Structures are given as structure tokens and as C-alpha cells.
């Protein structure tokens, strides 16, 4: 919800949608022993004109999350992906690569404004946790997404990380203001701008 408000504050657009890509842990539907990532994504989309205050958006976000992250929706997406992979496995790589580049260039990560990934509460054995000051994880930056945000909580400290390709600080500043307004004690750490 705060990301929608910060996203609106960070854009000059007056129309269109803010869309946040949220990973869904597929292990809750298909138990797996692997430590490899097993997730799919759903998109929570709200028109910019409807992003006004937190209470008015909570019901809409919950409704979309419930519908789009449901087992039925994830199975449908997984089945579609599997069918596409099975169909494309017979197409030569020399044909697939240029087509994939064109499709990614046309859509790519432009269909989402931001990404949010939450590892949740991480617990460690006391023999290890006493040596850990804090914990974080950072998503890689995307070519066009405004920001990739990640959250992890360890030892009652929640770390919210933002990775992005732009130097415009309006998204982070709005997130800071919103958290402060909610009475959350915020400590900000950052890295210097990296220019290639």
C-alpha cells in the first residue's frame, strides 16, 4: 500500500496504473524439499487516479492478492507456462533468441512499475543469531522498473531495501515520509550512486 502511494508521488503521470509485481511462494501449493527458488508472480494494479489514501486501497489490494495469488490462479499460470515451454522446446534456439529479445523489448519489465519481495521473518539458532547484527537481501535492478523492493525481518528488525536504476530520490523520500507518519522508527542507510 505504501509502495503505491510512493510510486504515485514519484511519477509525473496523471493517468495509467501503478502495478506492483509480488512473488507467490509455490511451495504452499506444491510441497518441495529443494532449496531452489520456486515462485511465480502476480501483479497488483491500481489506477493512479484511485491512489489517494491508505484505507481506501486496502480492500482493493487484499481483493487482488486473494484472487491473483490463489492456488487456482497460480495453477492456471503454471499450466500456461508449461504448455508454452513444451511447445517452444522444438523451436531452434537461433529462432527463439531474437524473438524473445523483441518480446522482452516490447513488454519486458514495463508491465510492472515496481517489484516487492518479502522473505518474512527469518529465524536462526541462537548459536548463530548472536553473531548476526542485521539481515537484508536486495533484488537486482530492472531496466525500466522504478524500484525493486525487498523486505526481511530478523530479531524484531525489519529491513526494507530499494534497488533502482535512477538517481531521482522521490520514491525513497515518500516511503520515508509515509513510514514516519505511521510512527515507524526509520534508520536510513544507502550506497553512493553508481554510474557505468
Q: Where are the language model's segments positioned?
A:
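Membrane-embedded hairpin module used as a gating/binding unit in multi-pass transport
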Residues: 4-5
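Acyl-thioester-dependent acyl-group transfer interface
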Residues: 8-196
Amino acid at each position: 500500500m505504501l509502495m503505491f502511494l510512493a510510486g504515485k508521488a514519484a511519477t509525473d503521470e496523471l493517468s495509467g496504473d501503478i502495478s506492483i509485481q509480488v512473488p507467490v511462494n509455490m511451495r504452499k501449493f506444491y510441497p518441495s524439499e529443494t532449496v531452489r527458488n520456486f515462485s511465480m508472480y502476480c501483479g497488483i494494479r491500481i489506477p493512479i487516479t484511485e491512489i489517494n489514501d491508505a484505507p481506501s486501497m486496502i480492500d482493493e489490494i487484499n481483493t487482488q492478492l486473494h484472487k491473483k495469488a490463489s492456488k487456482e490462479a497460480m495453477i492456471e499460470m503454471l499450466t500456461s507456462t508449461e504448455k508454452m515451454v513444451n511447445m517452444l522446446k522444438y523451436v531452434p534456439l537461433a529462432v527463439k533468441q531474437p524473438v524473445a529479445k523483441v518480446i522482452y523489448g516490447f513488454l519486458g519489465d514495463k508491465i510492472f512499475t515496481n517489484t516487492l519481495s518479502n522473505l518474512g521473518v527469518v529465524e536462526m539458532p541462537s548459536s548463530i543469531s548472536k553473531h548476526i547484527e542485521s539481515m537484508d537481501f536486495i533484488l537486482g535492478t530492472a531496466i525500466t522498473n522504478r524500484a525493486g523492493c525487498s523486505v526481511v525481518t530478523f530479531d524484531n528488525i525489519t529491513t526494507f531495501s530499494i534497488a533502482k536504476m535512477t538517481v531521482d530520490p522521490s520514491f525513497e523520500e515518500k516511503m520515508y515520509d509515509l513510514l514516519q507518519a505511521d510512527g515507524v522508527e526509520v534508520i536510513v542507510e544507502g550506497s553512493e550512486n553508481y554510474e557505468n
